[in-house]
From Swiss-Prot:
Subcellular location field: Cytoplasm
Top EC class of this enzyme: lyase
Recorded metabolic or biological pathway in which this protein acts: Amino-acid biosynthesis; L-arginine biosynthesis; L-arginine from L-ornithine and carbamoyl phosphate: step 3/3
Protein name (database record): Argininosuccinate lyase
InterPro entries: Arg_succ_lyase_C (IPR029419), Argininosuccinate_lyase (IPR009049), Fumarase/histidase_N (IPR024083), Fumarate_lyase_CS (IPR020557), Fumarate_lyase_fam (IPR000362), Fumarate_lyase_N (IPR022761), L-Aspartase-like (IPR008948)
Gene: argH
Length: 468
């Protein structure tokens, strides 16, 4: 027996039967796209105002529609969005409630509009706000990193390559690396916001509309820079969502790297940081454990965010122009990416603000592993006139001999040093301190405490001027 068509459906006139129950379930997006209710109502109010101003509908109908939409916004804000699968999506949910409130004029709201340009408009508005909220989260993380970098501009730690001690750096300098990554992340979201800020509204289904609409007016009312120039492009492309997911994936990679370092630094072999109770968990069987779960979860969320970009790319990669229902799944993907990144940023900011750094252990490890060997090679170039490659060879021989004796370079016996090269004297070796090493790195972007403080001041000045 065929299902009876739903007379309240917005599109059921040409159908003799209603959808199967499973069809209704797979077709409905209201459980997901109800998050667009504020954007949908805002866009509908702008559209109704334009219809009235252009005399496409009467001023009385436009006013009634606006009052009804304002009431719906109040209802949804107070009680949430009702979920009725028969209404499919947020657009039809709003329109159905509007009809209950104002009657026949509600049917005039959709004049010169399709759900294709409606959803594209809502989605761009939502993504625009999402870019701004992620930017605020990145700014908060930058601020926390800058504060901790300022506190530790002089604190010495080992710099690593291949996770082997390489050269001494300051903890402040190390943290500033993540400030720079966050700066570029903010730039990517700003670029994404700028490119998405064009209005699809008025493109209708795909070909535009025969009504004398004012697309510039609705674009301006919604804060867009301009209407989109091609109606097919307006309803069919989701590159703005892809760009958001790409920026989110890169930001998540940066967060994951910092999270990994916190996990490593908190481990007993390193012991560089003490995790606060607020950002740790324990074990159900081992009472001594303090696990860096917050950092591990941030690291894990990066996989979700990388997957979000891939998922959305696979959805859109083979779609012919213009609209296909595959695009219904774009919103769940982007919503999930936003939620994961926003939560990760908040968690990482909290950890950075409250980590206790064990700078004594950091300095001790920084002074091991022949970390000042490059300083000795540089001295031989500057003071003894050796070509760098020869100096590199000489210092390598010194390190090899020190390893054989089980000592660090400053403790290499004078006779052994002199046997390698006469310029390597006890006084020279004694000057190979980690403090002298970091102080000498005065090149722009270097780890010298003076340079670190300059970089912090520059970053704060840029933030104050909105130039991150």
């Amino acid at each position: 027996m065929a299902n009876t068509p739903d007379k309240s459906s917005m599109w059921g006139g040409r159908f003799g039967g209603g959808p199967a129950a499973i069809m209704q379930e797979i077709n409905a997006s209201i459980p997901i796209d109800k998050r667009l209710w504020e954007e949908d109502i805002a866009a509908s109010r702008a559209h109704a105002a334009m219809l009235g101003a252009c005399r496409i509908i009467s001023a009385d109908d436009a006013a009634a529609i606006d009052r009804g939409l304002a009431q719906i916004a109040e209802e949804f804000a107070e009680n949430g969005v009702p979920v009725d699968l028969s209404l499919e999506d947020i657009h039809m949910t709003v329109e159905a409630r509007l009809k209950e409130l104002i009657g026949e004029p509600a049917g005039r709201l959709h004049t010169a509009r399709s759900r294709n340009d409606q959803v594209a408009t809502d989605f761009r508005l939502w993504t625009r706000t999402a870019c701004e909220r992620i930017d605020a989260g990145l700014a908060a993380l930058q601020s926390a990193l800058l504060q901790r970098a300022d506190e530790h501009a002089d604190s010495i730690m080992p710099g690593f390559t291949h996770l082997q001690v390489a050269q001494p750096v300051t903890l402040g300098h190390h943290l500033l690396a993540y400030v720079e990554m966050a700066r570029r992340d903010r730039g990517r979201f700003a670029d994404a916001r700028r490119r998405l800020n064009e209005s699809p509204l008025g493109a209708a289904a795909l070909a535009g509309t025969g009504f004398p609409v004012d697309r510039d007016a609705t674009a301006a009312a919604l804060g867009f820079d301009r209407p989109m120039a091609n109606s097919i492009d307006a309803v069919s492309d989701r590159d703005f969502a892809l760009e958001f997911c790409a920026a989110a994936a890169i930001a998540a990679i940066h967060l994951s790297r910092l999270a990994e370092e916190i996990v490593i630094w908190a481990s007993q072999p390193f012991g560089f940081v003490a995790l606060p109770d607020a950002w740790s968990t324990g074990s159900s069987i081992m009472p001594q454990k303090r696990n860096p779960d917050a950092a591990e979860l941030v690291r894990g969320r990066a996989g979700l965010l990388l997957g979000a970009f891939q998922r959305l790319a696979v959805i859109v990669k083979g779609l012919p122009l213009t609209y296909s229902k595959d695009l219904q799944d774009d919103k769940e993907t982007l919503f999930g990416a936003f939620d994961a990144l926003a939560l990760s940023l908040a968690a990482m900011t909290g950890m950075v603000e409250t980590l206790s750094f064990r700078t004594d252990r950091m300095r001790a490890l920084a002074a091991s592993g022949y970390s000042t060997a490059t300083d000795l090679a540089d001295w031989l170039v500057r003071e003894a006139g050796l070509p760098f490659r020869e100096a590199h060879h000489v210092v390598g021989a010194c390190v090899r001999r020190a390893e054989e004796l089980g000592v660090e370079l400053p403790a290499l016996p004078a006779a052994d040093a002199a046997a390698i090269h006469a310029a390597v004297t006890p006084d020279v070796l004694a000057a190979l301190t980690v403090e002298a090493s970091v102080a000498s790195r005065m090149s722009y972007g270097g780890t010298a405490p003076e340079r670190v403080r300059q970089a912090i001041a520059a970053a704060r000045a840029a933030a104050a001027q909105g130039q991150d």
